[in-house]
From Swiss-Prot:
It holds the Pfam family RasGAP_C. One of its GO terms (molecular function) is calmodulin binding. It comes from Schizosaccharomyces pombe (strain 972 / ATCC 24843) (Fission yeast). This is Ras GTPase-activating-like protein rng2. Transmembrane segments: none annotated.
């Protein structure tokens, strides 16, 4: 029965009378442990309530709170509460897993980051494994004080000491503390410790606000007050006697010096209560003042120096019979305190000076290095700025000088022109005309003045706004540079000012304040002048606008006044105008009379000016019509030239014989001169005829090869001269061998990585079971040792290259059939495509389909060479066609369960074109990744909250809307600027991608082209945008997005990227994904990218044009220059490497659905192979039992015999080989002549010599496909070749009319493509090296992950070994006698042995039934273990001998049976039936407890 336990009850129990001395000691220790446990539960309750107050959630009862902290979820939530700006991923799980350590590490990083002293930190094992949970509670207490002192968190409230806990809770805590052997921290000294850290030493007067008086502070009379000088890990119970003795000795020593007895506390207090005021009894120094005594004024000076522990209070609170003495003077107390503080300050000062002296050399060196770096950096910045400023100032000066010179020149010209009288006359004449025009214009303007004013204001406003927008755009681009330059200049100015300040302080300490004030005032004036100068242009513009507005307003007022008085001034104006006109005419007439000659001269000048103007106009008109004039002139010249040519031809026609004779004489002369030069050169170089011959032969061979390469129908003899080019050199052979080894290594690396991943997953499961204490460490070590880090078995690394010579007849037969089987699957893509359709039709799970995709990629060698890449692309194309015919919409082709996407991802899942993507994404990554603080957050609500953080914290404020956020000018400006930057980045990416579209991998282009063809075929109603939208999504998400969003995975950037940088990349990716979707959409669907809708639509059109270029590719056979007959022409067979289980799995799957994937024709190649192989159980045992990799040299045997198309190809290739041998023996003008030419003995001898050379060459390199040619005579060879050509002529592949020139052209094409094959092989080698590099990097990552798991296992092993103990046997029990018998026989198992009666196991439910064995009463079952995870079950009977009484059981088999819900297990040949769950329970309880 649970009984509530309170502090009063515990204290009453502690004070109860007890019996003997020994029992008193034990009881006191037990009560002390109970009090400690109760006090610790109170501290746990305080920590729980503080966390609940911070998080606002209920954390359950106090008794389970300590264990609930082990997964770190509560601590991680606490971190998220105090750091809301950081995204923290918290791992939740009901079961404790190793990944919970991430939550704990986040909390440890948090307390380290905020500066919590390391003395309060705990280790990961303290909380995860529960080794020291009190230290975790102590850390939470310290964190609460640390944050509450900074007003970042609520204070921790002391729990009421009348809390009630059950006896069971207290006993659990006592038992746990006793087992862990952990010393409880001193929670009571924690608050004072933080007060000590926060208080300055030199404080003389107590401040009522320095230490807030919360509920956690108690008075001096409280029984649990602790010393501020005690260690955090000092237990009050352990240092009880030490404090008592030290306090007592200190008091006695102090009073022994005064030769008086020790007074009591009351005797000291009484005089001071009467004589001293209340405020004089307060503590003199808040540094020594306990926080619990701030509010108590009636304390004596002796209380200040007494240690605030229970024993010391008890010491001074008891009255004694000692004699009274006079009170101590207050000055003495102050002096003692001052001396104490002085000693402490001097000690600290000495320590500080000593540390500074010890580190002075390092500090001086560091300061010198820093000053040097700052000086060099400042010099570089100033020099760069000075160079830029010099260039700028030079250009400004040159512009200014030019402007001044032009102004002076214009001024001089105007002055010279003003002196001329002609200008005066012209001005007078023009003045009259202008005044007339002015009056008429004024009258018209009066009608349209309001409209003009409105138009002008609108235009000025538009121009002003446009100029401001342009100016802001330019400023936004230079804001980061301005900020950086300003920060550098401010820092430099600040350092200069600070150095000057220090110098001035050291030199002139008296004028320090005046210098500072003067400096500050000058700085403020300079800053004000600088800001005003920076806005000078704006002020000038504002003044101009103001003056213009005032002038227009004054002009408008004058016009209104004039309009009001128009009627009264009309008559007066007419009279005045008439008078002025008459007077003006008279003056003009007089001036004309005086300047008659000048007028005539002016008129002549005016006529000259008019004439020159007309001429200029005419010239301008002619220049505009210049192309027409040139065209007309050229036509006229052509007519004239043709007339001259016709006349010349007529003249030459009459002299043709003479011209021909002259030309022949000239040619003869030139030829004779050329021949004579060659003859002289030959005679001159007669001494070195070998060089001449080699030059001549080289020229002849060059001409012959040019003829072979360019001629449409090259001669047979030309082809014969270059037949040797078809032979492979030693270098070619070495490259082929290297390429094969590389392919083999790639396949092996892929499998190794998969093996490690599977092993890591198994270890993860085993570790989880180990943590839950379900299995022992030894079972985990079984997997650990099976694939230990850095040690792999030689059998796993050794590749079993099974050859045809090392197998027996049966195995050789099956291996050859499997080689034919996989060749058929490779070369005919319809079989595998139909196989996947059959799987999807049967509703196969996605896991099995992915496994089938993995196996199929192994058949094609993951496209590691040219041949397999062509075949794989053809297979993917066929799968796309079949799936496009079955889907309902075009978008369904992009679903994740489409087989063609799985195939392409497995084939091109890794990006190999790193250099290409560095070119395309270089600028984007430089902008987004280089700056760690760049943020492209475009949500206006978030931006508004960043400018107004108080809005987010106010709960009673109205709901924030998007329109309200956009009305905020800073938010709107930042939103627009970030959209503008994103638009620039998108434009740069699209331009770079368009420029490098030719470098995109061919596999991606071909797959996109096949996708386009399939969509156009099966969705004829789909418009162009829809089709290219599907292609764009595929290209973007399959190839572009992974590189753009995760550049660190592809080594495009150095190191890793932060969460903010990845968020910026995702923002840019959102815009690009919308652009690549091609199809138009409503602008409302763009969300916050709505202002970019016009840009996105335009970019979609450009992207569609780019995708059209991307899908414009040739067939794989043309691109890779792959011949359909290449497998039969090459002397080396294609090779793939597969495991025995994969071979049998693929074969069994294909054989199961053979009726669905192959036509019903019996002669079908696939059916023929499957029928020959038969079921898997009937195959050769040696081949089936082999678990290593098998080398399959693919054999086209069935294709050449059964398949008509393959038979035709084989016929063509064999005939070409026969012709190659024939033309090397005999010569002729054409192929038909050589074939019908009779065979002589010399031809037979030459044929035998050729066979001997070929045999030696092939024996050194590799085997040929067909060895029958070496058994033929030359006559038989010619007869076979002629028969094949006749057969090909019947099939339409050869024609006798052109002497079988088609065969010669085909051989010439093979010769020309030989060098291209070498280049292609080199490209394959480069691609293989890159693939191996990527696979090795992945292997390194997997190895590091495996190493971490292994280290955890080693740590767990050490933990369990330290706790492992040997159970004691009960004397004279059945187990005791059983173990004694085993020791006598020397057969004691390593891990134990247990013997049970069968009846007992039957009663427990372990044994279900017994058959063909003795009865349960007479049968005994023995279970023993001598190896890890391996148990021996033995049945014995004392009366009857049991046949075959032993069997072995493996723990993996038992766990698998339990996992597969197998209820019973049959052992001993079915004679015993065991309950699976109960038997496993028995095993775990006996061998793994």
């Amino acid at each position: 029965m649970d009984v509530n336990v309170g502090l009063s009850r515990l204290q009453s129990q502690a004070g109860a009378p007890v019996g003997t001395k020994g029992s008193n000691t034990r009881l006191a220790a037990k009560q002390r442990e109970t009090l400690q446990a109760y006090d610790y539960l109170c501290r746990v309750d305080e920590a729980k309530k503080w966390i609940e107050e911070c998080l606002g959630t209920d954390l359950g009862p106090t008794s389970t709170f300590e264990q609930s902290l082990r997964n770190g979820v509560v601590l991680a939530l606490l971190v998220q509460k105090f750091q809301p700006d950081k995204l923290i991923k918290i791992f939740y799980s009901n079961e404790l897993q190793f990944r919970h350590s991430d939550n704990i590490n986040k909390f440890l990083d948090f307390i380290h980051g905020i500066g919590l002293p390391e003395i309060f930190h705990f280790e990961l094992t303290d909380i995860y494994e529960g080794k020291n949970l009190p230290k975790v509670i102590y850390c939470i207490h310290a964190l609460s004080y640390f944050l509450s002192m900074q007003d970042l968190a609520p204070p921790l409230i002391k729990s009421d000491e009348n809390l009630s806990f059950t006896d069971e809770d207290v006993s659990i805590i006592v038992r746990r503390l006793r087992q862990s052997n952990v010393i409880l921290p001193n929670f009571k000294a924690l608050s004072a410790d933080f007060m000590l850290r926060a208080s300055p030493v030199s404080s003389r007067t107590p401040s009522p606000t320095r230490f807030p008086k919360h509920a956690r502070f108690q008075t001096l009379n409280s029984s649990d007050s602790a010393s501020i000088y005690s260690s955090p890990y000092t237990s009050p119970t352990l240092e009880f006697s030490k404090k008592d003795a030290s306090a007592r000795s200190d008091i006695l020593k102090m009073h022994r010096r005064t030769k008086s007895a020790t007074p009591s506390l009351e005797q000291f207090n009484e005089p001071y209560k009467q004589t001293l005021p209340s405020h004089s009894i307060e503590f003199e120094d808040s540094f020594f003042q306990p926080p619990s005594q701030k509010g108590h004024m009636q304390r004596s000076f002796l209380t200040t120096f007494s240690a605030p522990t229970r024993r010391r209070e008890a010491l001074f609170s008891t009255t004694s019979g000692l004699s009274q003495r006079s009170p101590v003077d207050e000055k003495i107390v102050n002096a003692i305190q001052a001396c104490g503080r002085g000693v402490l300050v001097r000690l600290r000062l000495v320590d500080m000076l000593q540390s500074l002296v010890e580190q002075s050399s390092s500090v001086v060196l560091l300061q010198a290095v820093i000053r040097g770096y700052i000086s060099r950096n400042t010099y570089r910045i100033r020099k760069k700025a000075y160079d830029e400023l010099v260039n700028w100032v030079t250009s400004i000066q040159s512009i200014s000088r030019a402007y001044l010179i032009r102004a002076q020149y214009r001024k001089v010209v105007l002055q010279e022109e003003a002196t001329k009288s002609i200008q005066t006359l012209q001005s007078i004449i023009r003045g009259g005309f202008y005044r007339r025009k002015y009056h008429s214009l004024i009258e018209r303007l009066d009608l349209f003045t309001p409209s003009f004013v409105l138009i002008q204001s609108s235009a000025l406003g538009f121009l002003t706004r446009h100029a401001i927008v342009n100016m802001l755009d330019n400023l936004y681009n230079y804001i980061p540079l301005f900020n950086r330059m300003q920060s550098i200049l401010r820092a430099n100015m600040f350092r200069n000012e600070w150095s000057n300040f220090l110098d001035s302080v050291q030199s002139f300490p008296v004028s320090f304040h005046s210098i500072c004030k003067g400096r500050l005032i000058r700085d403020s004036i300079n800053r004000l002048n600088g800001s005003l100068l920076g806005e000078l242009d704006n002020f000038i513009k504002l003044q101009n606008l103001s003056r213009g507005f005032m002038i227009r307003r004054a002009f408008k007022e004058k016009l209104e006044k004039l309009k009001a008085s128009t009627s009264s001034f009309i008559a007066l104006q007419a009279i005045v105008r008439a008078f002025l006109l008459r007077k003006n005419l008279e003056s003009i007439y007089d001036s004309f009379q005086k300047s008659h000659l000048s007028v005539i001269k002016a008129q002549s000048l005016y006529r000259g000016f008019i004439t020159r103007t007309k001429i200029d106009y005419c010239n301008d008109y002619l220049l505009k019509r210049l192309p027409d004039i040139v065209f007309m002139q050229s036509a006229v010249r052509a007519i004239l030239l043709r007339d001259d040519v016709n006349y010349t031809e007529v003249q030459l026609d009459s002299f043709i014989p003479e011209i021909v004779l002259l030309q022949s004489l000239i040619r003869g002369y030139l030829s004779r001169n050329k021949f004579s030069r060659k003859l002289q050169n030959f005679h001159k170089n007669m001494e070195n005829p070998i060089v001449a011959k080699s030059i001549f032969r080289g020229r002849q061979e060059g001409l012959a090869y040019r003829e072979l390469a360019t001629a449409k129908n090259p001669p047979v003899m030309t082809v014969k001269n270059f037949v040797h080019l078809l032979d492979d050199t030693n270098f070619d052979f070495e490259e082929e061998v290297l390429l094969e080894k590389m392919r083999k290594e790639i396949v092996q690396q892929v499998r190794d990585n998969e093996e490690i991943e599977v092993h890591i997953n198994e270890l993860d499961v085993k570790i989880a079971l180990l943590v839950k204490n379900k299995i022992s460490l030894d079972d985990v070590l079984k997997h650990h040792n099976k694939y230990k880090f850095g040690k792999q078995s030689t059998e796993y690394l050794k590749i079993n290259t099974l050859s045809m010579k090392s197998l027996n007849n049966s195995s050789r037969k099956f291996l050859e059939l499997y080689q034919c089987f996989f060749y058929v699957l490779q070369t005919n893509e319809m079989y595998l495509a139909n196989y996947f359709q059959a799987l999807k039709t049967e509703g196969t799970s996605s896991v099995k389909i992915r496994h089938a995709v993995y196996l199929v990629l192994q058949i094609f060698g993951h496209g590691s060479n040219r041949r397999e890449e062509v075949l794989l692309l053809r297979f993917i194309s066929q799968v796309i066609k079949l799936e496009a015919a079955l889907v309902n919409s075009s978008q369904d082709l992009l679903s994740d369960d489409c087989v063609w996407k799985l195939l392409f991802t497995g084939y091109r899942g890794d990006v190999r074109e790193v250099k290409l993507w560095k070119t395309i994404l270089g600028r984007i990554h430089k902008v987004l990744v280089a700056d760690n603080h760049l943020d492209f957050e475009i949500n206006p609500l978030t931006l508004f909250k960043s400018f107004n953080p108080e809005v987010a914290s106010q709960t009673d404020s109205p709901k924030l809307t998007l329109s309200l956020a956009m009305q905020h000018p800073p938010t709107r400006n930042l939103y627009v600027s970030r959209l503008r930057e994103l638009r620039k980045l998108c434009q740069s990416f699209l331009v770079a991608l368009s420029k490098n579209i030719e470098n995109i991998p061919y596999a991606l282009c071909y797959t996109a082209a096949q996708l386009k063809n399939s969509l156009q075929r099966y969705f004829p109603a789909a418009h162009k945008e829809e089709i290219f939208g599907v292609i764009g999504k595929f290209v973007y998400w399959a190839y572009v997005a992974p590189v753009l969003v995760s550049p660190d995975n592809f080594k495009l950037v150095d190191g890793s990227i932060t969460a903010l940088q990845r968020k910026n990349l995702y923002t840019l990716s959102s815009i690009l994904s919308e652009i690549f979707s091609i199809e138009s959409c409503d602008s409302k669907q763009l969300g916050f990218f709505r202002p970019l809708s016009e840009f996105i639509e335009v970019s979609k059109q450009d992207t569609m044009l780019m995708l059209e270029r991307l899908v414009d590719v040739v067939d794989p056979e043309v691109y890779f220059e792959f011949d359909a007959f290449e497998d039969l022409v090459n002397t080396k067979r294609p090779v793939i490497y597969m495991k025995r289980d994969d071979i049998l799995g693929i074969y069994s799957s294909i054989a199961y659905v053979i009726d669905s994937i192959a036509p019903p024709d019996v002669n079908d190649p696939l059916r023929a192979v499957v029928n020959s192989l038969g079921p898997v159980s009937e195959q050769d045992n040696d081949f089936v039992q082999d678990e290593t990799d098998v080398k399959l040299e693919l054999n086209p045997k069935f294709c050449t015999i059964e398949n008509p198309v393959a038979q035709e190809r084989t016929l063509i290739v064999q005939t070409k080989r026969y012709i190659l041998f024939i033309i090397r023996i005999q010569n002729g003008l054409n192929l038909l002549e050589i074939l019908v030419k009779p065979v002589t003995d010399s031809d037979e001898a030459a044929w035998q010599n050729l066979l001997a050379e070929e045999s030696e060459k092939n024996a050194r390199n590799y085997d040929l496909f067909d060895d029958s040619i070496f058994s033929m005579s030359f006559a038989e060879l010619k007869y076979t070749a002629l028969s094949n050509i006749v057969e090909m002529e019947k099939l339409g592949f050869a024609n006798r009319r052109n002497n079988y020139q088609d065969m010669v052209n085909s051989i010439a094409l093979d010769i020309r493509n030989k060098s291209r094959r070498r280049m292609q092989r080199q490209r394959e080698l480069d691609a293989g090296h890159q693939s191996l590099l990527n696979l090795r990097e992945k292997r390194a990552f997997l190895d590091s992950q495996l190493k971490s798991y292994n280290e955890y296992i080693e740590q767990a092993m050490e933990t369990l070994q330290s706790k492992k103990g040997k159970k004691k046997l009960i004397p004279f029990s059945k187990q005791y006698f059983h173990m004694r018998d085993l020791r006598k026989s020397g057969r004691v198992p390593r891990f134990g042995s247990f013997k049970y009666p069968a009846l007992k196991l039957y009663d427990r439910g372990v044994l279900v039934s017994i058959s063909h064995m003795p009865q349960k009463e007479k049968l005994y079952i023995t279970i023993s273990a001598d190896e890890v995870g391996k148990f021996i079950l033995e049945a014995t009977s004392p009366t009857v001998k049991v046949s075959s009484p032993r069997c072995e059981l493996h723990l993996d088999d038992l766990l698998s049976a339990q996992y597969n819900k197998v209820l019973t297990l049959d052992v001993l040949d079915g004679r015993l039936k065991l309950n699976t769950n109960m038997f496993l329970h028995l095993i775990f309880s006996k061998f793994y407890s």
